[in-house]
């Protein structure tokens, strides 16, 4: 779905606001997973998506340029899967996926080919049976990332400390003896 900001009603600081379901034509089994600000639907930009089961998908942003009242299908999901995160990318970004086991994989977005809107996607990270993907990040290799555990422990780590691999691996350990939130 997409909604122009001026279509959202202005409200006072203390007002409750208006439910998004009243502004979007969501089905009963649908919910809002993420919100992306888009000013123009460029041919040179992509929407990068990641699911709970470690699947990733890259779709050209221009494929979402037409507005439909019933929304536009962005990804096909299995019954027990759900969208964890989305990002607008250039096609050459560094992608980071973090798992509930404290592992993080870093790979270049170019390892994921552009797909149509209804495609399922490809494996971004290999997860064990009880693991889930908990975060999708797009990062600059010269920057640092902040990792925070469910128990409130946090640390900053240089992105370069995580080796860049091909997509589909298990990733490197970013946290040990850690309980991360499950979604």
Question: What is the predicted function of each stretch?
Answer:
Residues 71, 121-123, 169-174:
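Acidic/polar low-complexity surface segments
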Residues 1-63, 67-68, 79-80, 84-85, ...:
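Duplex nucleic acid-engaging cores and interfaces of nucleic-acid transaction enzymes
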Residues 175-182:
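Conserved small/polar residues in nucleotide/adenosyl-binding loops
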Residues 2-3, 55-59, 65-69, 103-107, ...:
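Short loop/beta submotifs within extracellular cysteine-rich repeat domains
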Residues 78-79, 87, 126-130:
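A general structural motif
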Residues 11, 26, 67, 115-121, ...:
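Conserved, well-folded catalytic cores of nucleic-acid-processing
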Residues 44-56, 93-103, 128-163, 178:
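Surface-exposed interaction/gating patches
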């Amino acid at each position: 779905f997409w909604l122009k900001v001026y279509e959202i009603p202005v409200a006072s600081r203390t007002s409750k606001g208006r439910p998004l379901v009243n502004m979007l034509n969501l089905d009963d089994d649908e919910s809002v997973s993420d919100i992306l600000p888009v000013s123009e639907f460029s041919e040179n930009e992509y929407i990068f998506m990641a699911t709970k089961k470690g699947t990733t998908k890259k779709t050209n942003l221009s494929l979402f340029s037409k507005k439909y009242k019933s929304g536009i299908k962005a990804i096909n999901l299995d019954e027990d899967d759900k969208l964890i995160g989305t990002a607008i990318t250039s096609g050459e970004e560094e992608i980071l996926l973090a798992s509930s086991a404290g592992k993080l994989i870093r790979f270049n977005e170019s390892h994921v080919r552009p797909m149509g809107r209804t495609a399922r996607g490809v494996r971004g990270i290999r997860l064990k049976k009880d693991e889930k993907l908990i975060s999708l990040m797009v990062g600059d290799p010269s920057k640092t990332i902040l990792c925070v555990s469910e128990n409130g422990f946090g640390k900053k780590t240089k992105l370069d400390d995580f080796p860049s691999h091909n997509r589909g691996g298990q990733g490197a350990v970013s946290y040990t003896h850690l309980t991360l939130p499950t979604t």
